[in-house]
Amino acid sequence: MKNILIVGAGFSGAVLARELADRGGWKIRVIDSRDHIGGNCHTEREKSTGVMVHKYGPHIFHTDREDVWEYVQRFGEFRPFINRVKASIKKGVFGLPVNLHTINQFFGKNLSPQEAKEFLKTVGDDGIQEPANFEEQALKFLGRDLYEAFFEGYTLKQWGCSPTELPASILKRLPVRFNYNDSYYNSRHQGMPVDGYTAVIESIFDHPKISVELGTEWNETMKKGHDHVFFTGPIDQFFGYSEGRLAYRTVFWERKEAEGDYQGNAVINYPEKDVPYTRVHEHKHFAPWEEHEKTVVFTEFSKETEEGDIPYYPKRLAVDMKLYESYREQAQKASGVSFLGRLATYRYMDMHQVIGEAMDFSTKVLEAEGGGQDWPLFSGE
C-alpha cells in the first residue's frame, strides 16, 4: 500500500485523494495551510444573515462532461442554477455576454439574428486584418462603442494593464450571441450545491483511508515517510520563488449587509473606468430556493498580487510564461513529486476542469503504477 501526501484541500487535492483511496486502496494524507477545506471554493453560512456565502468570490458549477456531472452529484445535492450576469453602465443595465437583446437595447434597434450579424460587420473595424492584441481583436469584431462600454474599462480594472498589452487570444472567438440566451455559460449542466461547495468537498474526503490536516504548511521534510507528494499549490512557492514570483491578479471585497433585496441579481458587473470596482455579488441570489430577510453584498476590487495575497488570475504574459517554464525545468529534476491544479500548472481553470483533470490524472497515476512506469509529472498533459 502506498503512503501519499497531497498538499492542498481544494477540488484538485480532494478528487485525487478520493480516487487514489477508492481505486488504489492507498493511504492518503492531505494538508492545507488554511483553517478550512475547499480552497477558493469554500462556502459558509453566515450567522448574521443566514446566507450561504462564497467566501472567495462566486463559483457556479457548469460542465458538458457527463462523468464530471455525475461525480459531483455523488457527494452532494445540486439544484439548477443559471448565472445571468448584468452590466451596469451610464446608459442602463444590460445582459452579458453580449447577446441579441444587448445589441438591440444598446443601439435602440429591433434586429433579427442575421441583421445583427450584418450590423456588427458595419461597426467593426475592418481595417484590422490580424489583431495584435485584445483591444484590436475586440474592435475588429465588436466595434468601438460596444468595446468601450463593456470591455475596455473592465479589462483595465481586472488585469491592471492596458488591453493593448494583453494577447488577442483572450478573445479567441466573437463574444456575442445572436439570440436572446442570457445564460452566462453554454454548458449542458449548470447548478449549485444545496449545502455549499465545502460540504461537497467534505463528503469527498469522507473515506477511511484519507486524513486531512488543516493549518499545516508544506515543507520539504514532509516527503519523509511518504512514497510520493502531489502538490496543488503555486509552483513558484514550491521552489521557494527561486526564479521569482509568477504574476497573478488578486481580488478583495467590501462587505455590506442590507434588508430585503439589494440589487435583484446575483452578479452585476461595472465595466466603466470611473467606477473603481469590477462587480457586485449578492450571495442570496446564488440559492434562489432559500428565503432570507437580510442580504449580504460583496463589492469586488482587483489588484496586483503581493506577498501574502491569495493568487486568483494568472496573467500569463510572455515574461510570466518564460518564468513558468523555468520552474517546469526545475520540476523535471525533482523526485517524488507531481503537480496538479490551476496554481501548480499556472492556468486559469473552472471547477469542472479542475475536477475532470484530477479524475483523469488519478487514472494516469494508477495505470503508471500498475504498468511499472514513471508517474506523470504534471496534470493536463
Label each PLM-derived region with a short phrase.
Residues K2-V30:
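N-terminal Rossmann-like FAD-binding beta1-loop-alpha1 element of flavoenzymes
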Residues A21-K47:
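Glycine-rich FAD pyrophosphate-binding loop
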Residues R23, T216-Q330:
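Mid-domain catalytic core of redox enzymes
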Residues I28, I210-L214, V337:
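Generic structural signal for residues in well-ordered beta-strands
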Residues C41-E44, V98-L100, H226, E293, ...:
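Short aromatic-enriched loop/helix-cap "lid" or pocket-rim segments at secondary-structure transitions
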Residues R45, H281-E381:
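Conserved flavin/dinucleotide-binding core of flavoenzymes
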Residues T49-V123:
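Dinucleotide-binding Rossmann-like beta1-alpha1 core, especially the glycine-rich loop
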Residues K90-F94, L100-H228, F239:
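Active-site/ligand-binding neighborhood in enzyme catalytic cores
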